[in-house]
């Protein structure tokens, strides 16, 4: 097993594994440092419902990942956005934009299994698992040295480029001296699978409430994926609800658009915070995925943004012999600036506005939704971002061979 690679990725979650696949298919020698042992899924691959934008579906199909899914996905053909207690609403139809779907709903665990199946078939990929990042070692010319700990003890890896894809509290990002800007939304997100008297019909509902958003996502197994935000101080109470009380709470939040809610699967809870890296690159290093930006789930843009980051990086690496040069990384950061800043601003602004219960903001919220419904240009801006086609989009996301 060699300890020298073109690229070492620390973190085998959604973005890290996707980048490893993209680079390996380009012939790049990749080392992947993973916390989970062989045969065990990383914790991120749970029962969460992932909303893949159309651009993301294009890219993952080109990478051979979507074909590995063993369970059906749920197509999103229309989007319905409203706010509890306000009169405005937005309704979007994919066919109005020349598309069959806005994207697909995929269960995180199913996606993890598909990634694993794809990783298994790659040459040029060395997997270190279970292993953890310990720190950086003295560098050699043209390489970055990093220390990892695995079952055999500590070892030093050498890479022309190190990628930090190790999550919101990234140890690699911290070791690089990259600071973060943080905001705690004071909310907790509950995720579950529910069954209703009406099966999914391709509509994704986003219901905005005083304490946070509630989304209903059309899964491919005739269930709905529910994402329910509550104020942090209510989280323990909501977690303690029995299924009858839990379903009643959801029914009040979403109304009767999908009929009566009749059953719920296990609930998981996640605190919601915004953690944004102050810069994306360092000396022969890049931060990606949640290590680069952990954003509010409203609009379901987190993984979609992270994948566009990863594929843009893969494109830049393909353009030169040395993936870690300062000019290559500067070009990457410049290409990602517009999409990243717009997505961060949209997600954060919408989260803060819609979660603020002040009656003074009610006319603004309602007028905003009414204006969105009436103005095709505003809808087109929303749709372009939601589908992942706004700004400098990687070729695989556009459905082009690369």
Report each predicted region and the residues it spans.
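N-terminal Rossmann-like FAD-binding beta1-loop-alpha1 element of flavoenzymes
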Residues: 6-32
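FAD/FMN-dependent oxidoreductases across multiple families
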Residues: 236-324
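Conserved N-terminal helical subregion
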Residues: 2-4, 61, 69-175, 182-188, ...
């Amino acid at each position: 097993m060699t300890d020298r690679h073109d690229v070492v990725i620390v973190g085998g979650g959604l973005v890290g594994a996707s980048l490893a696949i993209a680079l390996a298919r380009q012939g790049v020698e990749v080392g992947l440092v993973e916390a989970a042992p062989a045969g065990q899924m990383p914790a991120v691959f749970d029962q969460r419902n992932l909303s893949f934008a159309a651009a993301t579906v294009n890219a993952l199909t080109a990478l051979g990942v979507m074909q590995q899914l063993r369970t059906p996905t749920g197509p999103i053909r229309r989007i319905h956005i409203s706010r509890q207690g306000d009169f405005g609403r937005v309704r979007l139809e994919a066919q109005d934009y020349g598309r069959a779907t806005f994207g697909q709903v995929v269960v995180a665990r199913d996606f993890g299994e598909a990634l694993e199946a794809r990783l298994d078939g790659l040459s040029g990929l060395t997997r270190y698992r279970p292993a953890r990042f310990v720190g950086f070692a003295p560098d050699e010319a043209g390489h970055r040295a990093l220390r990892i700990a695995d079952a055999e003890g500590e070892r030093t890896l050498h890479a022309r480029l190190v990628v930090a894809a190790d999550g919101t509290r990234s140890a690699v990002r911290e070791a690089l001296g990259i600071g973060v800007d943080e905001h705690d939304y004071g909310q907790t997100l509950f995720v579950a699978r529910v069954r209703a008297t009406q099966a999914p019909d391709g509509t994704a509902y986003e219901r905005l409430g005083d304490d946070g958003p509630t989304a209903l996502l059309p899964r491919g197994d005739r269930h709905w994926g529910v994402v329910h935000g509550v104020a942090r101080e209510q989280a323990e109470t909501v977690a303690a609800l029995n299924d009858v009380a839990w379903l009643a709470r959801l029914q009040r939040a979403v109304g009767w658009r999908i009929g009566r809610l009749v059953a719920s699967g296990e609930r998981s809870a996640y605190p919601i915070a915004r953690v944004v890296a102050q810069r994306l690159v360092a000396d022969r290093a890049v931060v990606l995925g949640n290590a680069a930006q952990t954003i509010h789930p409203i609009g379901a843009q987190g993984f979609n943004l992270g994948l566009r980051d990863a594929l843009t990086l893969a494109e830049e690496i393909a353009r030169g012999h040395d993936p870690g040069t300062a000019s290559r990384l500067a070009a990457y950061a410049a290409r990602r600036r517009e999409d990243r800043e717009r997505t961060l601003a949209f997600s954060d602004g919408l989260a803060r506005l819609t979660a603020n219960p002040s009656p003074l903001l009610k006319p603004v919220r309602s007028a905003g939704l009414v204006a969105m419904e009436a103005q095709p240009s505003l809808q087109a801006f929303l749709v372009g971002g939601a589908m992942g086609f706004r700004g400098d989009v990687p070729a695989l996301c556009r459905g082009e061979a690369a």
